[in-house]
Structure formats: structure tokens, C-alpha cells
Amino acid sequence: MVKQKDYTIDSDLYSKIEIYLKNKDIKFIEKAYNFAREAHDGQLRLSGEDFFEHPKQTAIFLADLKLDSSTIAAALLHDVVEDCDCDSQDIERIFGLDVSRLVDGVTKLSRNDVIGDSEFSPTTNFYDEDIPEDIAQAETLRKMLMAMADDVRVVLIKLADRLHNMRTISFLPLNRRLAMSRETIEIYAPLAHRLGIWEIKWLLEDLSF
């Protein structure tokens, strides 16, 4: 059996995926892991940690749910199109159509977030624009439900993405934290409930108060 030392991949992620995935699938995830790590090289979050820690933690949580290799790879890559010098054609060419579609789906959903992943960057100017008092809940929820109908894995990645962002929300200004918490309670926790993923639902609710 191939051991963790034979992979250039985080031990926390490896320890979860080696339980249920074949070696070829782990190699595929390793490829996405290294691609995303290099793409995000030099980028930081407000916490001071490497930006890559965010997609890595997103992937680790989905590995807890024992999702397929394409989903784990897409979780690792979910910010590269929006935040790096990379486009969806690059993702499709290197990782295939399935992963590319998942990344595109998450990218489209993220554009509806009141607080996006990019706002966790220390270069963000929080005073460029005000947050609207009324979050467009119905429109955002409609798009997420449409994504569920197309491929539920897109929403699962987005839920894991939101979970890690909520765990690091303390580094945002108060107005951003309040807006993001409200959006999480009104949109993301109910979606987790709808999917029957109780652990994510409870965690999101706890982190929103």
C-alpha cells in the first residue's frame, strides 16, 4: 500500500482520503493540492495564515463526508479562478470537465455572497462600499437550489467553504461579521438542513451567534 510519505500532500487530508479512496484518486487530489498551493503562493488571509489554508480546510471537511476525488479536488481549486492567474479553461485542461464544472459552479455561487473569500485578504478595503441592509436572500437561495438540481456537490463545496470562513470570521470588521452571520443563518444553515447534513447545520448555527 502507498504510504503518506510517498505523497506531497497534507497529512490531515491524506489520513482521511486514504481510508476510502484508491491510490489513483489520491494522486489526482495530490495534483490539485499542489496546483492550488502554487497558485495561491504568497497570498495571505486576514488572520495572517496562508490563503491556501482555506481551500485545504474546505477539502478536509468534505473528506470527512467521504466525497469523491473530483469534489475534493474542486474544493482545493475553488478559489483559483477568482483569485489567481487561472481560468476555467486551465482547470478543464488539467483536471477535466467534471472538476471544471464544479469549480465554475462554486465561483458563480460565491458571487452572490454578501462576504466573499476575497474579503478575508488583508489587502481588502472594507470602506469601498456599504453592505446593503437587506440581503438578497430569495435570489441567492434560488441560485443555490438550482445548483443542487444540477449537481449537489457544488452546494456541498460551498457549505464547507462557508464553514471555514465562519470559523475565521473574527478577523473581519463588525459590520462584515454581522452581515455574514445573518446570511449564514438565513441561507446556508437551512440548506445544510435540507440536505440532511446536520453537523454542518449545527456548526454554522453555532458560529453565527
Residues covered by each model-derived region:
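Active-site helical microenvironments for divalent-metal-assisted chemistry
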Residues: 1-209
